[in-house]
UniProtKB/Swiss-Prot annotation:
It comes from Lycosa singoriensis. Disulfide bonds join 51-67, 58-97, 60-83, 69-81. This is U2-lycotoxin-Ls1c. InterPro entries: Toxin_34. Residues 1-17 form the signal peptide. Coiled coil: none annotated. Insecticidal to house crickets. It induces an excitatory slow-onset impact that leads to irreversible spastic paralysis. It also modifies human voltage-gated potassium channel Kv1.5/KCNA5. Most likely, it binds to the voltage-sensing domain of the channel, suggesting it does not block the pore but prevents its opening at physiological membrane potentials. The recombinant peptide binds to the channel in an irreversible manner and slows down the hKv1.5 current activation kinetics. It is not toxic to mice, when intracranially injected (at 0.5 ug/g mouse).
């Protein structure tokens, strides 16, 4: 009986240590995301400018502008993404951008 209690306690401690480690990783990721949003707040790229395809569409100036990348752009070195006009749903998606005050009237 005591063996089962000890094994159960060890399992609880092991699971607890993993959850603490995961929460620390999550806090670090949140801090990095906050830094990225600070950069997005500071500047928005004009239409036609080269943008980073790995980041959100918030980097492009305007409610309907999005970062548009060519087909298989990740595998071609010369391929670059540009801020181009998107559809109406792009404006709906960009309502949650932190830098929307720059282009909203």
């Amino acid at each position: 009986m005591i063996k089962y209690v000890l094994i159960s306690a060890l399992l609880v401690v092991a699971v607890y240590s993993f959850t603490i480690e995961d929460s620390e990783d999550a806090l670090l990721e949140e801090a990095e995301d906050e830094l990225d949003t600070e950069e997005e707040r500071r500047m928005a790229l004009p239409p036609g400018a080269v943008c980073n395809g790995h980041k959100s569409d918030c980097q492009c100036f305007g409610a309907k502008y999005k970062c548009s990348c060519p087909f298989l752009w990740r595998f071609r070195r010369s391929a670059k993404c540009h801020c181009k006009k998107g559809w109406a749903w792009t404006a709906i998606k960009k309502r949650s951008c932190h830098n929307r005050y720059q282009w909203s009237g």
